[in-house]
């Protein structure tokens, strides 16, 4: 077999393949033997029918089509291996010569990972927002904790924001009651905005057994999206009494003896939550700083696949109803054109990030260990509320493990670069990234990039490097949702 590669663009190639007919003859012999076992021809025992008779009965062209259909995928894979091409997506294949006794010829056009000239990482610096825990934020946490230990007391007064009420609801469209839209004895915290838009405003000021009618859009059922006249009747009103924020409360609600110690602990919790956000900001700022230094060509089909994943996620929550989706966009002050433009821009940026990180992982010789994969599996399963074993089984069944592997490999590449970067906050403080990403390796990242690495960066879950180019982010999320 002979193959050659023509570079059509930085992200697309055409592979020309010629397969000598002699290489296909064993395939023909096997196909005829299988066919002979399956057919019954007068005068011949099963499996003994002559080839000439089988050709006359079923047609040589039909057999040729079957052989070619079976041969092209394997020969395409062989051509990929010989040329060391890393494809992105499925190829567009065209058979250019197919004749019995003649060489088989076909072309395959496919998107590929582009060659990326990696930037100089020497002196890479990024800036992120400074973090602090304000008194207001600490007080809000304290109020939330007090609310958990509060008691509800029934009161004889009109409803006010913050009250807990029991209500009856009914709805009508065009004067006709809406079936299944009535409910009795619903509990609601006034001001939470959890039940129906407009409900909180409608109940404030009402006393027990008083009613009010307001207009709201129905979210589900046969009348979903239509305006309905909603009637709400207040059945009871309770207010929450909060414990005093003193030492006694601190001992009741925590392991601390004093309210000052509890406040200090809450302040640290606020800071810790902000550190998580700061770590993500460092990650994104590091990638953005790299993208500013390098040009990353983007395969259009790869971007399109990413966009379709975004659209699929957006539509899945409304039963893939595109008409309703377009209406919701208009209600939110947007449009389908604006959504498509924003989604495509975001998809292109995501693809650039993925391709850049794959190239970095190659040059940094990133190795993904079992511990790295296990950690990601546990974190993802917690995020979606399922058991790690359940998620692993789903990923394996749906061939999503290579995507998760690729995602973890990219994260390790970002981690390595962030460890070597100089990170400061907007107040001018230098941030110790080891708190987020651990200590840097003994060999500096910039030294590794200067090495004459051949790009063979370990193996993926299937034992080769091809799948490191997969768009893992969306796939992993979809897989986790499916497993749930």
Curated annotation (Swiss-Prot):
One of its GO terms (molecular function) is peptidyl-prolyl cis-trans isomerase activity. It is found in: Cytoplasm. Residues 427-484 are annotated as: Disordered. Keywords: Cell cycle, Cell division, Chaperone, Cytoplasm, Isomerase, Rotamase. Consists of 3 domains; the N-terminus binds the ribosome, the middle domain has PPIase activity, while the C-terminus has intrinsic chaperone activity on its own. The keyword Magnesium does not apply. Coiled coil: none annotated. The lineage of its organism: Bacteria, Bacillati, Actinomycetota, Actinomycetes, Mycobacteriales. It comes from the Bacteria. Residues 444-476 have a biased composition (Acidic residues). It catalyses: [protein]-peptidylproline (omega=180) = [protein]-peptidylproline (omega=0). One of its GO terms (cellular component) is cytoplasm. It comes from Mycobacterium marinum (strain ATCC BAA-535 / M). GO terms for biological process: 'de novo' cotranslational protein folding; cell division; chaperone-mediated protein folding; protein transport; protein unfolding. Belongs to the FKBP-type PPIase family. Tig subfamily. It holds the Pfam family Trigger_C. This is Trigger factor. Residues 162-243 form the PPIase FKBP-type domain. InterPro entries: PPIase_dom_sf, PPIase_FKBP_dom, Trig_fac, Trigger_fac_C, Trigger_fac_C_sf, Trigger_fac_ribosome-bd_bac, Trigger_fac_ribosome-bd_sf, Trigger_fact/SurA_dom_sf. Its main location: cytoplasm. Its EC number is 5.2.1.8. Involved in protein export. Acts as a chaperone by maintaining the newly synthesized protein in an open conformation. Functions as a peptidyl-prolyl cis-trans isomerase.
């Amino acid at each position: 077999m002979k193959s050659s590669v023509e570079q059509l663009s930085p992200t697309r190639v055409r592979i020309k393949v010629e397969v000598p007919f002699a290489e296909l003859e064993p395939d023909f012999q096997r196909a005829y033997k299988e066919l002979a076992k399956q057919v019954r021809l007068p005068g011949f025992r099963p499996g003994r029918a002559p080839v000439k008779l089988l050709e006359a009965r079923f047609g040589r062209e039909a057999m040729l089509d079957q052989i070619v259909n079976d041969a092209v995928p394997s020969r395409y894979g062989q051509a990929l291996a010989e040329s060391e091409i890393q494809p992105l997506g499925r190829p567009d294949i065209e058979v250019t010569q197919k004749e019995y006794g003649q060489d088989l010829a076909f072309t395959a056009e496919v998107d590929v990972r582009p060659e990326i000239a990696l930037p100089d990482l020497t002196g890479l610096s990024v800036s992120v927002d400074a973090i602090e825990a304000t008194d207001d934020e600490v007080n809000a946490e304290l109020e939330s904790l007090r609310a958990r230990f509060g008691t509800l007391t029934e009161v004889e007064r009109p409803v006010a924001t913050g009250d807990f009420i029991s209500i009856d609801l009914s709805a009508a469209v065009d004067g006709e009651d809406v079936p299944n839209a009535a409910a009795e004895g619903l509990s609601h915290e006034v001001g939470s905005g959890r039940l129906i838009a407009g409900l909180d405003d409608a109940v404030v000021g009402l006393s027990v057994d008083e009613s009010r009618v307001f207009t709201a859009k129905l979210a589900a059922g046969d009348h979903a999206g239509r305006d309905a006249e909603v009637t709400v009747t207040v059945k009871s009103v309770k207010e929450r009494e909060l414990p005093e924020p003193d030492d006694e409360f601190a001992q009741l609600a925590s392991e601390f003896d004093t309210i000052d110690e509890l406040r200090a602990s809450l302040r640290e919790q606020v800071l810790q939550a902000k550190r998580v956000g700061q770590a993500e900001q460092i990650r994104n700022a590091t990638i953005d700083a790299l993208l500013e230094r390098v040009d990353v060509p983007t395969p259009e089909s790869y971007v399109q696949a990413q966009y379709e994943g975004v659209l699929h996620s957006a539509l899945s929550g409304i039963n893939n109803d595109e008409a309703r989706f377009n209406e919701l966009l208009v209600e939110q002050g947007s449009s389908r054109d604006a959504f498509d433009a924003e989604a495509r821009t975001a998809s292109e940026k995501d693809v650039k990030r993925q391709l850049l990180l794959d190239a970095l992982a190659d040059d940094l010789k990133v190795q993904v260990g079992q511990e790295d994969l296990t950690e990601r599996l546990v974190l993802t399963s917690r995020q979606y509320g399922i058991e790690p074993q359940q998620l692993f089984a789903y990923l394996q069944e749906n061939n999503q493990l290579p995507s998760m592997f690729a995602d973890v490999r990219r994260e390790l590449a970002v981690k390595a670069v962030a460890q070597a970067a100089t990170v400061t906050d907007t107040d001018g403080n230098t941030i110790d990234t080891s708190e987020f990403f651990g200590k840097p390796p003994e060999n500096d990242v910039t030294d590794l990039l200067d090495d004459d690495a051949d790009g063979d960066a370990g193996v993926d879950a299937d034992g080769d490097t091809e799948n490191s180019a997969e768009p893992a982010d969306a796939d992993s999320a979809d897989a986790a949702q499916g497993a749930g």
